[in-house]
Amino acid sequence: MKKRVLAALMCAAMAMTLVVGCGSKGGSDDASKDDAAADSGSDVITVGFSQVGAESDWRTANSESMKSTFSKENGYDLIFDDAQQKQENQITAIRNFIQQEVDYILLAPVTETGWDTVLQEAKDADIPVIIIDRMVDVSDDSLYTTWVGTDALLEGRKASEWLNAYAEGKGIKAADLNIVDIQGTIGSTAQIGRTQGLEEGVDKYGWNLLAQQTGEFTQAKGQEVTESLLKQYDNINVVYCENDNEAFGAIDAIEAAGKKVGGDIANGEIMVMSFDTTKAGLTDTLDGKITCDVECNPLHGPRAEELIKKMEAGEDVEKLNYVDEEIFAHDDTVKSVTAVNSLDKEADYDVTTLTQEILDQRAY
C-alpha cells in the first residue's frame, strides 16, 4: 500500500517536470497522458498467492476463484505459485513475494505447522498475509492478518450427525455401522477437522471404526487404500471419504470388487460419504453413488478481496472469516441436522435433497 502511494508521488513529480520543461501545448498534453497513466498504474494492487497444489477438483475451483477475482480487469496483478504439495516450495514462494514487494500475500498452506519463520519475515516487511482454506498453527497469531476458509470441524460434525439421523431413519442399529475413514493429507486443516468430526460421532453413537488411512485427497490413492481395506475387512458398509476425489477412487474400488455402492446398507450396499460438493461429486450424489456430500465451498476469492478492500480503506478485519456451506444428500431421509461449529456455537443445518435443477445451478 505504501509502495503504491510513493510510486504515484514520484510519477506526479516527473509529470510536473515535463510540463515546466516543455512549455508547449503539445508537451502539456503528453504530460497529462503520462500523469493519467501513472494514476491508473498506482491503483493496481499486487497479490502473491501460494497455492498448495492442484491435487483435487476442489483445489482447481479454489485456484480459479482466486484468478478470476484478482484479475487485471479488477485492478490486480496476481502472482500465482503452485507449490505442488510441498511446504518448502511455499516458503520459497513467500520469500520471493517479499523480495518482489507485493502488497498482499495469500497462502493456502499444505499443512498447519512450520510457518513461524517465513511469516515473521513477511510481518517484518509490513506485508499483510491472508491465510486461505487450511489454517496455520503459529506461536503468535499476529504473524498473519486474517484467515478465509471453511469450518472443517463443523463439516465433520455435520457428516456424523447426518449419518446418525440416516441410520435411525432407516432402522439401522449404531452397532451395525462398520466404517473406514479415508483421510485427507495428514496434518491439513481439512483432515484434522473431518477426522475429528467422525471420531466424535464414533464415541457418541457407538459405531465401529474399523480403520483410518490417508488417501492424500487424490482419486488414485483413495482407490488404492479402499482396495486394500476391502481385502482386510469383509464387513465394511460405510466408506467415509474426506474429499470427493477420494470418493471417486473408493467407488471405483468398491465396484471393481464386485460390490454395490449405495445407501441401502441393510441389503448389502456400501455407503460412500464425502466432502467438497464439486460438480462431479454432486453428480455422483444425484446418481446415488455418494449418499451424502458435505459442502466445502472453494470460492474464497471474493471474500479475500472483500478483506483486502477493507484493509485498503484502513478498516479492521475479523481474524476468522468462514464461507457459507450446505449439506447435500441423495434422498430426503434426513431433513436437517444440529451441529456445533469450531466456535462452540450450535445451530440447525438443512439437508438439501439433490435434484438435476439444483446441480445445473451450481457454480462449481
Where are these regions (language model features)?
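Short, low-complexity disordered leader/linker segments with a strong preference
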Residues: M1-T46, S71-K72, D77, Q120-I127, ...
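Hinge/cleft segment of the Venus flytrap/periplasmic-binding protein
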Residues: D43-I45, D181-I186, E200-V202, C296, ...
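Extracytoplasmic "Venus flytrap"
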Residues: I45-E73, L78-T92, N96, Q100-V102, ...
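Hydrophobic alpha-helical segments within soluble ligand-binding/sensing domains
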Residues: V47, Q90, V148-D176, K221-Q223, ...
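Flexible loop/hinge segments that line or gate small-molecule binding clefts
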Residues: T117-L154, N178, T278-D284
